[in-house]
């Protein structure tokens, strides 16, 4: 009996779907069947396993779930029930708030945990504001809309929530919050204390597909001599029912005209579909199709996710069994074999995955002072205004992902003092370090430098690109730092070949480059350079012509929003490509609140940490007294722990160490991240540098102090 006479296995299709619909689906021509779907049939599309970013308008948008908690609610208003309403705003206008959702009513108390979670779409390149409004509720099913019933409000930026690295943010409650204070990053000091809120965000469970590949061997043919059929297979998930089992269709392979040793392409299955239970049975049908499109059945086999996870080998070589042939022939063994040749659990990490796991963004700025023609005062003022707007637009977003808000700034294309030699790479602040404190520090350095330098007629951008590339390689542990360099130019660039080489080198660095052309100059050569295919490993550069984004008839915030969206749109994609090329996986999210009450017991190993902010400004002038441990012991001033100030970016910028009454005072800014990234050994080394390693509390030998002239040395550290 030939295979053409063999009937398909007994129909065990899901009872919730139409059998006729599935019959029509399987009897359709192959090319049409793969392009259409049936209601109730979940088909996992066969796509490339190489991680890639979508090309939508907002390619790196992610959904987060926001939850709100009130602590120490101190309002004088009376209420029996209270609700929380969330509004979002992407503008600077107070009348543009749109409602996100409303929580269910909660009984009024000093500490309220709203169990409802608000789903929100996060976009990196946008300034997104969230306003939480807490109001009394008179009707259980309808919150009050009157302004008199509003008890407190709080406004925060979504960037601050994501950039807090613990996905948790603390804010003070206000009676009437405004957008200006939220955008400035400072909270107003009010006479009336209303309490605070804790804003937490969670990322929904992400899709983690599995990649599978099968090869066949000696599969039965329709005709032994004149066989022109193509062989393929279908994957089903087997679900057990009360009456009978059902099959859920998952995937269908391509058809190959090779029965002896077909090698199908790898395909992807969603873990939720194929492995909701590790021992969930997967039934695979091996079939053939002739030139007329008619299909026939060869056999089937069963497997599970847990078994395939062992990988290629003898455990994953399956016999294809045809139940009809097996019942008719006693000598029947199988209708061929199927072998698993690839099985991979794939995790596609997104930009948000890396940010919440601790990756910091750093912003570097390069300003080109050159001009091919003499600049009039009016043109210079326009250039300064556009430069200020562009730096503010881009920097106001990136700064929320920068813990210390320090930005490196460079000058290009000018004669610099004191010798007034030509330079295309100098620090904008004319210091030994290019770091400026905040965006205000960058603009102040630019204004001072503008009065001190003489512009050139042409410039070179490659020196600054190479400098920042080297700086990004030295920024710390791989995967924890990513840099964004913005180059502002209005003149003629003469080193296009060197720029191309610098961009190729930067493709291996954690760096994205934004070249922003300003004014009416012809930037066609730079546009062509940035748009053509690079020899590097990934795309790192984007060109933006600022004039095409500005509209004088619109409000300034609209121009700023347009600049930020255009300039930063591809930065998440660049960062994800770098992480994937470097095989850097995102770590689990850091579950730490970046608040002034940040707890870091790891600063001194094996010592409990106590926080007393009232003692921060009460440092003794002579020495450090420890009455609780050694009542009669006064340590000399040379043993007092003094933070080092000679290293920029070290933890001494955030720490104020004071050993008094057995306590350690720690000052950490809200978005500080360096503490959690430093290993135990590094902190011990840093404590030695600051002099703390010479003391070990609470054991201090008085005889040691007397014999050593006031110095204590413990060999155990």
Curated annotation (Swiss-Prot):
This is Copine family protein 5. Residues 377-567 form the VWFA domain. PANTHER family: COPINE, COPINE FAMILY PROTEIN 5. CDD domains: C2B_Copine. GO terms for molecular function: calcium-dependent phospholipid binding. Residues 193-318 form the C2 domain. InterPro entries: C2_dom, C2B_Copine, Copine, Copine_C, vWFA_dom_sf. One of its GO terms (cellular component) is plasma membrane. PROSITE patterns: C2.
